[in-house]
Amino acid sequence: MAGSPLLWGPRAGGVGLLVLLLLGLFRPPPALCARPVKEPRGLSAASPPLAETGAPRRFRRSVPRGEAAGAVQELARALAHLLEAERQERARAEAQEAEDQQARVLAQLLRVWGAPRNSDPALGLDDDPDAPAAQLARALLRARLDPAALAAQLVPAPVPAAALRPRPPVYDDGPAGPDAEEAGDETPDVDPELLRYLLGRILAGSADSEGVAAPRRLRRAADHDVGSELPPEGVLGALLRVKRLETPAPQVPARRLLPP
């Protein structure tokens, strides 16, 4: 080093300047090297305790941390409210869109239902994409509706044959109370012709039995009267009486019972 031409030669000045520059760059800041200057204090001034001097620093450090935590919580709550409002708005928009789509589908279906039907309803469905039936099918597929269930709601259900059968006429013999109406509703349906036939047979049988039994009773009573005591006019009066008794009286037509 002592005989180095860089330090003792003609280039020694340049190398010295380079060393000084390097020392200036790598030198620590003056705040680290400077010693703290103590302020002059009087003898009567008491030095503050270490606890009091350290407490404000901790307080100054804790206060910003608490404020930052509160700000983060407020920001999280605001973000949660914003997300909830956005979710509700999206759900409301989806429900409104689905309702509008169903309304459009029903309106189109009613329009197609009320339109005059052609002889061949399947004609032109495949060729014409703008046909009402094709549009209706696309709308149903888009709305994810069941065409069979929708048609069942629009088409009236067939009336059963029992409801189309004519009911027998109801004969009202007088005012009937609610008990009679309830009893009449509970009775099973019976053919009225069969009822009329049975009632006619019963009435005809009772009338024949009464008509046959009455002349026999009258004949026995007349014979008894003739045998016991004869009238003063003789046998001719008795014969006339028997003849008069044997002639049947005109029968009163029996009342016809009508089905309820």
From Swiss-Prot:
Q: How is it modified after translation?
A: Proteolytically cleaved in the Golgi. O-glycosylated with a core 1 or possibly core 8 glycan.
Q: Name one GO cellular component term.
A: secretory granule
Read off the InterPro entries from this record: ProSAAS (IPR010832)
Annotated source species: Homo sapiens
> What is the UniProt domain comment for this protein?
ProSAAS(1-180) increases secretion of enzymatically inactive PCSK1.
Which Gene Ontology molecular function entries are recorded, alphabetically?
endopeptidase inhibitor activity; serine-type endopeptidase inhibitor activity; signaling receptor binding
Question: What this chain does, per the record?
Answer: May function in the control of the neuroendocrine secretory pathway. Proposed be a specific endogenous inhibitor of PCSK1. ProSAAS and Big PEN-LEN, both containing the C-terminal inhibitory domain, but not the further processed peptides reduce PCSK1 activity in the endoplasmic reticulum and Golgi. It reduces the activity of the 84 kDa form but not the autocatalytically derived 66 kDa form of PCSK1. Subsequent processing of proSAAS may eliminate the inhibition. Slows down convertase-mediated processing of proopiomelanocortin and proenkephalin.
> Top-down, what is the taxonomic lineage of the species of origin?
Eukaryota, Metazoa, Chordata, Craniata, Vertebrata
Summarize the impact of residue 246 to A.
Reduces inhibition of PCSK1
Q: What is this protein called?
A: ProSAAS
Q: Which residues form the signal peptide?
A: 1-33
Q: Which residues are glycosylated?
A: 53, 228, 247
- Region (C-terminal inhibitory domain): which ranges? 221-260
Q: Which gene encodes it?
A: PCSK1N
The record's listing under Pfam families reads: ProSAAS
Q: What biological-process GO terms show up in the record?
A: neuropeptide signaling pathway; peptide hormone processing; response to cold; response to dietary excess
Question: Where is the short sequence motif Sufficient for inhibition of PCSK1 located?
Answer: 239-244
Task: Return the Acidic residues bias intervals.
Answer: 179-188
The record's section on PANTHER family has:
PROSAAS (PTHR15531:SF0)
What result is annotated for mutating residue 243 to A?
Answer: Abolishes inhibition of PCSK1
Provide the effect of residue 240 to A: Reduces inhibition of PCSK1
The organs and tissues expressing this protein are described as: Expressed in brain and pancreas.
Q: Where in the cell is it found?
A: Secreted; Golgi apparatus, trans-Golgi network
Q: Which residue stretches belong to region Disordered? A: 165-188
Which stretches does the entry tag as region ProSAAS(1-180)? 34-215
Instruction: Quote the annotated effect of residue 242 to A.
Output: Reduces inhibition of PCSK1
Q: Assembly and interactions? A: Interacts via the C-terminal inhibitory domain with PCSK1 66 kDa form.
